[in-house]
Design a protein with these regions (language model features):
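His-Asp-centered acyl/peptidyl-transfer active-site segments
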Residues: 8-10, 28-35, 63-64, 121, ...
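Acyl activation and transfer enzymes in specialized metabolism, enriched
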Residues: 13, 43-66, 150-167, 238-280, ...
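Extended, hydrophobic beta-loop-alpha segments that form or line the acyl/peptidyl-thioester binding
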Residues: 62, 66, 282-289, 319-321, ...
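Active-site-proximal acidic secondary-structure segment that organizes catalysis
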Residues: 11-13, 23, 134-192, 413-427
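Short amphipathic alpha-helices and their capping loops
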Residues: 1-29, 52-98, 132, 167, ...
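AMP-binding/adenylate-forming domain of the ANL superfamily
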Residues: 11-26, 102-108, 162-163, 192, ...
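A short N-terminal helical cap/helix-turn-helix that marks the beginning
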Residues: 68-69, 173-188, 216-223, 333-335, ...
Length: 444
């Protein structure tokens, strides 16, 4: 059985999100899906030395990233891991001579992401160095083109925290490139998240949120994926990517403006419509990541606070896409209003396995000055069934990743689902007032 996290004197107190990840990782030490990563596609006259200094300073300013956990006698001890800025170097690789330099670089990184993490060492190895929970590699893939690959363990930082770190690296690099002094550090300490959780526990706000989610779970939907499925394989995730650009992006933007919703709500509504149409009218079962950062200053903490919330996506016979958009947007607003509440482990009414939404409505386009930067996700976390991740491109397009559990979806099945989703999204956005049944793709 996993031990209970404890703290040494002056050691960090973990957030609820960190405790959840630690329990899951210790229950399955070989699970690599909590290793998450992305790369920045950097194009232009990059100064690798200045970038190294920007990354070094950022890692120094975020001590909450440097943790280790000691195991022994049924307990887990959280403690700070030493970080020596003067000895730290940004690893550099060059794949520019490969037949496909970008694919070669990504393959190297996927090998890193596929390594099972070692979060703790037994008591007999008390002096052993802790494996880092974060890492970055700069890969030259061509003339004036580099990939800054970032990988993290979810116990150290969540997706929003990664965005904070990336923007800080960009701000420091931009200032150094211009010859300006480093801008003041914007980060708030990790303890702010812990203190906010402590203040929330037992409060009237928590009671109101608990009551809301109890009502929400009183009438559980019929699952949108009713067919028998094999046991999930938590260690194998398949991916298919849908890109929305050009005329498709313009059509999506018009539909979003016309319905007064967000692009995140639009891509969710389209998937809800697809699952409804392809599963005999069963209501889609969804869950969504929420930042769970509502306390003052919480949005400045590069750490882990994310929560997973159930999301109803009801679709009714005769609905148009505009009607589904309005309903999904209302569900998003209600869920976010109660996003701090976490169900106790094993509590009744927990959301069943279904689609997990990993949307990034916050700004993910860092400004590196005279070097353009585009964020490309590589791995986004565990997937029990199906996950939809989306990130906005600097040019206004969308990258939508459909990740599937390898024990649930085969390659061809996922490829077909992604292709049908892309087609249906385009039709729905182009004709948002037509009944869904008139726009449905052919049955798979």
């Amino acid at each position: 059985m996993p031990g209970t996290p404890q703290r040494a004197e002056n050691a960090p107190e973990l957030t609820a999100a960190q405790r959840e990840v630690l329990a899951a990782q210790r229950a399955d030490p070989e699970n690599t899906t909590y290793n998450v990563g992305q790369y920045l596609d950097l194009r232009g006259p990059l100064d690798a030395g200045l970038l190294q200094e920007a990354v070094r300073r950022t890692l120094t300013e975020a001590p909450g990233l440097h943790l280790r956990f000691r195991g022994g006698e049924g307990r887990v001890l959280a403690e700070h891991a030493p970080f020596a800025p003067e000895a730290w170097r940004l690893h550099r690789l060059d794949t520019s001579g490969a037949a496909d330099p970008v694919d070669s670089a990504i393959a190297l990184v996927r090998d890193q992401l596929a390594c099972p993490p070692r979060l703790d060492a037994p008591a007999a190895e008390a002096d052993a160095p802790a494996a880092p929970l974060t890492g970055m590699v700069l890969v030259r893939v061509g003339e004036r083109r580099h990939l800054l690959v970032q990988y993290f363990h979810r116990i150290a930082v969540d997706g929003y925290g990664v965005c904070l770190l990336t923007h800080r690296i960009a701000a420091l690099y931009r200032a150094a490139r211009r010859g300006d002094p480093p801008p003041a550090c914007p980060f708030a300490p990790m303890r702010l998240l812990v203190e906010a959780e402590r203040a929330y526990a037992g409060s009237a706000a928590e009671a109101a949120d608990r009551a809301y989610w109890a009502r929400h779970a009183a009438e559980p939907p019929r699952a949108a994926l009713p067919r028998p499925r094999p046991a999930p394989d938590a260690h194998r995730i398949r991916r298919r990517t849908v890109r929305v650009a050009g005329a498709g992006a313009a059509s999506l933007e018009a539909a979003v403006r016309g319905a007064r919703v967000t692009w995140a709500e639009a891509v969710t509504a389209a998937l809800a419509a697809q699952l409804y149409l392809e599963n005999d009218g069963h209501e889609p079962v969804m869950r969504m990541y929420a930042t769970a950062r509502t306390a003052p200053g919480a949005l400045r903490v590069p750490g882990a606070a994310v929560n997973v919330l159930p999301l109803r996506a009801p679709v009714r016979p005769g609905d148009s896409f505009r009607a589904v958009l309005a309903r999904v947007a209302a569900e998003f607003r209600a869920a976010r209003a109660h996003q701090l509440y976490r169900r106790p482990p094993g509590a009744s009414g927990a959301p069943p396995s279904g689609v997990l939404l990993n949307l990034r409505p916050f700004d993910t386009s860092p400004d590196f000055g005279d070097v353009s930067a585009r964020v490309v996700p590589l791995a986004s976390g565990p997937v029990e069934d199906l996950s939809l991740s989306a990130v906005r491109d600097p040019g206004g397009g969308l990258r939508i990743d459909l990740d599937a559990n390898g024990g649930v979806y085969g390659h061809e099945e996922l490829a077909g689902l992604a292709a049908r989703y892309a087609e249906l999204l385009g039709r729905l956005c182009a004709q948002p007032d037509r009944p869904l049944s008139a726009l449905a793709a052919p049955a798979p």
